[in-house]
Amino acid sequence: VQVTILSSNLANGATIGEWGFSALVEVDGNCILFDAGRYPDTVIKNAKVLNVDLSCVTDVVLSHFHFDHNDGLLPLIQTLHDQTAAEIRRIHVAEGFFSPRRPVINPGTFPTCMDGELECNLMIGLREEIASEGVEFIVHSKAAEIFPSVWISGPVERHHPEINYPTGTSASKLEVQLAGDWVDDFIPESQALVIRTQNGPIVLLGCGHS
């Protein structure tokens, strides 16, 4: 098992840091990209500096809809398809990933709701454009084994009334539409990637909202 961090808020001078996350996961010849970072070129540039070959990637797992985990997805797919032999075929998301979001407090402070935008989930609008690259979105309602010994958790049942948004006078707050009702956005689609090894499971999280 090899896990290489390609986007985070840490950098060593040669790599680029950002408010975002992405990791390449290599397991028994299978390559999975877990999240895609915030900016279009971060993952590509860091992979080059680290001598990481992204042409092996066939599957992407997105932990949740937030911009710092997937804004770089479409340009990344386009670049890999144009410049490498990569054939990204599937994107795995959990149920709730494409649910509408709306701002209810300080909408201008949430980056994807700027300029009066009422829909804060930009992945809804990008879904068809990404699919036009020949990539299939697979929406999971429960845990699934996507490769031998590689699992995604799917949506995680919540047992406690969590607050998954900042609090304070300047903080933003979103609601999510589920079954026709608007409720506080608890990020229902937040999921993990789990790798089973002889020494126990390896668990990768995005923000760990669930």
Residue spans of the language-model regions?
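Conserved beta-strand hairpin/beta-sheet module of binuclear metal-dependent hydrolase folds
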Residues: 2-50, 186, 190-209
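Active-site metal-binding loops of divalent metal-dependent hydrolases
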Residues: 8-10, 36-38, 65, 95-97, ...
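Short glycine-rich or small-residue beta-strand-to-loop segments that form or flank ligand, phosphate
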Residues: 33, 59-63, 94, 202-205
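Active-site environment of divalent metal-dependent phosphoester hydrolases
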Residues: 41, 66-70, 98-100, 144-145, ...
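Active-site metal-binding motif and surrounding structural segment of the metallo-beta-lactamase
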Residues: 41-93
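Short acidic low-complexity segments
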Residues: 53, 137-146
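Hydrophobic alpha-helical segments and helix pairs
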Residues: 84, 88-140
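Active-site-proximal loop/helix segment associated with metal-binding centers of metalloenzymes
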Residues: 105-124, 142-197
